[in-house]
Structures are given as structure tokens and as C-alpha cells.
Amino acid sequence: GIGRRKVSITIDKLSKEPIKWLPNPTKSYFADPFIVEHENGVDIFLEDHDIDAQKGSIRVLRLDNELNVTSEEKILETSYHLSFPFIFQHDGIWYMLPESGANQCVILYECTSYPFVWKEKKVLLNEPLTDAILFAFDSEFVLLYSRLDGTENRTVYYRTSASPFEFENTEKVLLADQPNIMRNAGALIKEGGEFIRPSQICNSHYGEGMQLNKLQRDNNGVLN
């Protein structure tokens, strides 16, 4: 489902606004939605997980301003699993950083005809990352992620760079290694001058819940 409301209202659980429920596919399920709003409506980029093949691809749903689906199309499919299609804009160009840990690397895609046509721009890191997000923080770019190494449900790392396209030779820094402060659950949110990072709760099982964490620097300039 999808609803429009301020983050502060959602946090306080005071919203009475209705949820618009989207059509449910029969042979797959949707997961990991990322939303782009524009004057004509909303685009939702998401994982389309084939139940029989047990493999995800990336699909976009186009909605009008009444949140009715007007079109949908599969936009990325590979021989390996894709999910978590984090999308961002830089210098007027849209980029996508889908989770491709099964391929032992993370690949950055560039949009050549929004929102349907994407081409591979470069391998951002030759590591099996999961749920990576990329954003500007202060005067640098931050790549925030977990690793598919058995610790992905409880540890989060980050790297910083002067460029959103160069992270290969940067230092890996541990953001958190404790229950509830875990792998990303979506894009960073800016609310009231603060940065909020949604994270997944996976203490007893995967998909247990979600929480919101304030992202800030300590006195030594380290993110936490």
C-alpha cells in the first residue's frame, strides 16, 4: 500500500489518512519500494520477486496523482538476484544502485530514458553488499551498507568519497554492530534538519520490523 503523509506524523502514529492498496501480482511479490514523486504522480521502483524462480528483478510502477497505477514495466533483469533498487539523482541524472550481492559486487546504473531505460555505468565496489544507499552528507558522499557475509542482519558499514562514483579505494568504517541498529530499510530521510535512517529489525527473524535512527557525527567526525 501507499499513503502520503509527513514523516513526523507517521512517527507519532497520528495519521488518519487512508492507504491506497496496489494490485498484487499472482506469480511474484513486490518488495523494497523506492518512490520518486513528480508533478504527474508517483513512480515506484521495486523488487519483483519471482516465486517459482526465487529470483528478483527490478520493476517500475507509474501512478497518477490519485495513486492509480497507469503503467508498469520490468526495467532490470540479470541472471542473478536483484533487489533493493535504491535510486538517486546527481547533476540532473538518475542513478540506481540495486542489491546484486549474488554477483559479488555492487553495480551502479545510469538512466538514459526515465524511468524505463537503464545502462550499467560501473562496478562501484567488488564486494557482496546488501541494501546499500548513497547520499551527500556535509561536504562528502557516503555509501552506507551491510555485507553478505553472515553479519548482514546486525552490522552496518560506510565509506566516504568526494565523488558519488569512486569508492573502491576508500576506508570501510563500522557504523554499528548491535541489535536493532541494522541493515538499511530504505532511503535516508531528512526531517526538520535531521537525517533519519530507516533500519530493519531482525533480532528473532528476517523482516521482524523496522525502526528509525538519527544519523549524526560524533565529536571525532565519525557517523553513528
Q: Positions of the model-derived regions?
A:
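Carbohydrate-active catalytic/glycan-binding domains of CAZyme proteins
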Residues: G1-N224
